[in-house]
UniProtKB/Swiss-Prot annotation:
Belongs to the glycosyl hydrolase 46 family. GO terms for biological process: carbohydrate metabolic process. It is found in: Secreted. The keyword Translocase does not apply. It catalyses: Endohydrolysis of beta-(1->4)-linkages between D-glucosamine residues in a partly acetylated chitosan. Aids in the defense against invading fungal pathogens by degrading their cell wall chitosan. This is Chitosanase. It comes from Streptomyces sp. (strain N174). Changing residue 80 to E/N: Drastic reduction of activity. The active site is at residues 62, 80. Keywords: Glycosidase, Hydrolase, Secreted, Signal. The lineage of its organism: Bacteria, Bacillati, Actinomycetota, Actinomycetes, Kitasatosporales.
Length: 278
């Protein structure tokens, strides 16, 4: 999963509130009173409310919308050399995670509409090829997106490959919700791994400049170093040369001292303004 801003999406106007019908974790509602919200003020990104915020922040950069649940059906080739990009965090046919997603979906629901594409997905893994996929695949993807089992499979793979490892590493580094989100957004775009422009390499570069809180360092100083390293990694690739998701989103929260990522949140991605009030 290495994604860029999806230019096919038309930027939405300012979203005044962001209270969806359901949260990233099913069955848990938003805090309904100031008192209950205050109790969660220092919650980690895996808190349902904070996780919903994280999903909306990523969607603002990936889809020019806070409605991340509308993205299960999304699929297109964005021309970055990674084949098709699809779903809620941009699973790619060329990087292996789309293959893993469809395999997981098939484990949950054998004989599903996408199962027949598993051989083709295995063949195109590591390339930009559409061989054996094409329009029939993209149409079937959109159909599958209506299936709650496929939606759950996307949620599962997002958490297994990206969200859970990012949050776990950030907590081990002594970072609060903003730092946990910075790690998550980085791993979504750059992928896991330890090469210089993958998440592990970006973290390693940052740790050469500043100590993590777990090492006795200052949290803000370290996060600035991490965002510097993230931006440098983005600039090595034309598909990621717009760094607004760092400059006018995460850095804005950091400069405001909002290390717990508490709403209200105001930011811009690709020049488009967004607001999460609660």
């Amino acid at each position: 999963m290495h994604s860029q801003h999806r230019t096919a999406r038309i930027a939405l106007a300012v979203v005044l509130t962001a209270i969806p019908a359901s949260l990233a974790t099913a069955g848990v509602g938003y805090a309904s009173t100031q008192a209950s919200t205050a109790v969660k003020a220092g919650a980690g990104l895996d808190d349902p409310h904070k996780k919903e915020i994280a999903m909306e922040l990523v969607s603002s950069a990936e889809n020019s919308s806070l409605d991340w649940k509308a993205q299960y059906k999304y699929i297109e080739d964005i021309g970055d050399g990674r084949g098709y990009t699809g779903g809620i965090i941009g699973f790619c046919s060329g990087t292996g995670d789309m293959l893993e997603l469809v395999q997981h979906y098939t484990d949950l629901e054998p004989g599903n509409i996408l199962a027949k594409y598993l051989p083709a997905l295995k063949k195109v893994n590591g390339s930009a090829s559409h061989s054996g996929l094409g329009t029939p695949f993209t149409k079937d993807w959109a159909t599958a997106a209506k299936d709650t089992v496929f939606q759950q499979a996307q949620n599962d793979e997002r958490d297994r490959v990206y969200f859970d490892p990012a949050v776990s590493q950030a907590k081990a580094d002594g970072l609060r919700a903003l730092g946990q989100f910075a790690y998550y957004d980085a791993i979504v775009m750059h992928g896991p791994g330890n090469d210089p422009t993958s998440f592990g390499g970006i973290r390693k570069t940052a740790m050469k400049k500043a100590r993590t809180p777990a090492q006795g360092g200052d949290e803000t100083t370290y996060l600035n170093a991490f965002l510097d390293a993230r931006k440098a990694a983005m600039l090595t690739e034309a598909a990621h040369d717009d760094t607004s998701r760092v400059d006018t989103e995460q850095r804005v929260f950091l400069k405001a001292g909002n290390l717990d990522l508490n709403p209200p949140l105001k930011w811009k991605t690709y020049g488009d303004p967004y607001v999460i009030n609660s």
